[in-house]
Amino acid sequence: MAALSPYKADFLKASIDGGVLKFGSFELKSKRISPYFFNAGDFYRADLLQAISTAYAKCIIEAHKSGQLDFDIVFGPAYKGIPLATAATDKLAQLDPETYGKICYSFDRKEAKDHGEGGNIVGAPLKGKRILIVDDVITAGTAKREAIAKIEKEGGIVAGIVVALDRMEKLPAADGDDSKPGPSAMGELRKEYGIPIFAILTLDDIIEGMRGLASPEDVEKTEEYRAKYKATD
């Protein structure tokens, strides 16, 4: 496997050093026991926020320059997506002011406001604009479908999604049989909406980059987890 690009390697190291990416034994919503856990809500310290905003911005710029992504507004779904989207917007303007100096951001409210400016959306109006959703991870895809529905209701056009981590993990089987092959939530969203979805890091990236940053036992357990639950897409 090729070495990680510098921004991915820097982000991975910051995530591990800052305790955002942890290794151990963690029960997920799916009831699977994962040897690693990533919590973007732990990027609350200024230096860690700098690390994640830089990684998001460089991932977005890379996708934009390759012609895979074009957008007008960065959208952060409430709640975790709000600081991620605003920080990414600011970092985009810092890294490339000529291209992104006037880029806008928006986010949604969980409950509509019935006074003042009212409505569900805070920030730039979405109508007729290409919207890039920025969030932490895609688990089952439910939250992203809700965000897409809100954007479309406001007249926006979803241009793509960028997340911090792609677990590359198959969805739980409806009958509970985890031995069956299956697609990932990210793959299902790509197929359902026909939009590009990007991740700063994938599970493959984590396994490649964690050597030397985590114990050999943690590397082995993470490799075993990938082999057991890796998606078919």
UniProtKB/Swiss-Prot annotation:
5-phospho-alpha-D-ribose 1-diphosphate binds at residues 29, 79-80, 109-110, 113, 115, 135-143. GO terms for biological process: 'de novo' pyrimidine nucleobase biosynthetic process; 'de novo' UMP biosynthetic process; pyrimidine nucleotide biosynthetic process; pyrimidine ribonucleoside biosynthetic process. It catalyses: orotidine 5'-phosphate + diphosphate = orotate + 5-phospho-alpha-D-ribose 1-diphosphate. Signal peptide: none annotated. Keywords: Glycosyltransferase, Pyrimidine biosynthesis, Transferase. GO terms for molecular function: orotate phosphoribosyltransferase activity. PROSITE patterns: PUR_PYR_PR_TRANSFER. Its EC number is 2.4.2.10. Belongs to the purine/pyrimidine phosphoribosyltransferase family. PyrE subfamily. HAMAP family: PyrE (MF_01208). Homodimer. Catalyzes the transfer of a ribosyl phosphate group from 5-phosphoribose 1-diphosphate to orotate, leading to the formation of orotidine monophosphate (OMP). NCBIfam families: pyrE. This is Orotate phosphoribosyltransferase. It comes from Neurospora crassa (strain ATCC 24698 / 74-OR23-1A / CBS 708.71 / DSM 1257 / FGSC 987).
